[in-house]
């Protein structure tokens, strides 16, 4: 049974007991999932760079995500003033940046990161936004290890 400040959440990874402080609010939802507003991050394995951004309302909705800086150093996320206000941050350094990951079944060598739609989370306020990027250097299907064009 869940304690007062805990939730029991069904996921594809099994049932989890989740403290309220692990709940992330996404006021605009995510692209394609605008009605999903509450998520949590679940570590896939201790030695893995991957997490699951799990919807708390839909057990079948869990997106594989990762810190893009684990795969590349040159990645500049632009966060507009309105988004910074909604997140409650003054600069990008106050937030965690994540990108969705696609690993085709049986073909891990074809893994791609979506650099054009990063997910930015203020861990302290527990608020997240998906913030589409307009910089064409950052594709929706970036293969880790592939060179990214430098800013001109």
Curated annotation (Swiss-Prot):
Xref: SUPFAM superfamilies: BH3618-like (SSF141457)
Keyword Cytoplasm: yes
GO terms (BP aspect): bacterial-type flagellum assembly; regulation of translation
Family matches, as InterPro entries: Flagellar_assembly_factor_FliW, Flagellar_assmbl_FliW_dom_sf
Pfam families, per database record: FliW
Chief place of localization: cytoplasm
Domain of life according to the entry: Bacteria
Localization in the cell: Cytoplasm
Cellular component GO terms, alphabetical: cytoplasm
The entry's keywords: Bacterial flagellum biogenesis, Chaperone, Cytoplasm, Translation regulation
The family this protein is said to belong to: Belongs to the FliW family.
Xref: HAMAP family: FliW
Function in brief: Acts as an anti-CsrA protein, binds CsrA and prevents it from repressing translation of its target genes, one of which is flagellin. Binds to flagellin and participates in the assembly of the flagellum.
Complex and partners: Interacts with translational regulator CsrA and flagellin(s).
Protein name, as recorded: Flagellar assembly factor FliW
Organism: Solidesulfovibrio magneticus (strain ATCC 700980 / DSM 13731 / RS-1) (Desulfovibrio magneticus)
């Amino acid at each position: 049974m869940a304690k007062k400040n805990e939730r029991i959440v069904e996921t594809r990874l099994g049932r989890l007991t989740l403290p309220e402080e692990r709940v992330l609010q996404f006021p605009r939802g995510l692209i394609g999932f605008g009605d999903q507003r509450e998520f949590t991050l679940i570590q896939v394995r201790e030695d893995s760079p991957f997490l699951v951004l799990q919807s708390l309302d839909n057990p079948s909705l869990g997106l594989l995500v990762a810190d893009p800086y684990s795969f590349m150093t040159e990645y500049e996320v632009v966060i507009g003033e309105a988004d910074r206000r909604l997140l409650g941050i003054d600069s990008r350094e106050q937030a965690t940046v994540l990108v969705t990951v696609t690993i085709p079944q049986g073909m891990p060598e074809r893994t791609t990161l979506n650099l054009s739609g990063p997910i930015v989370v203020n861990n302290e306020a527990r608020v997240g936004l998906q913030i589409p990027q307009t910089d064409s250097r950052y594709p929706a299907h970036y293969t880790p290890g592939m060179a990214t064009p430098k800013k001109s």
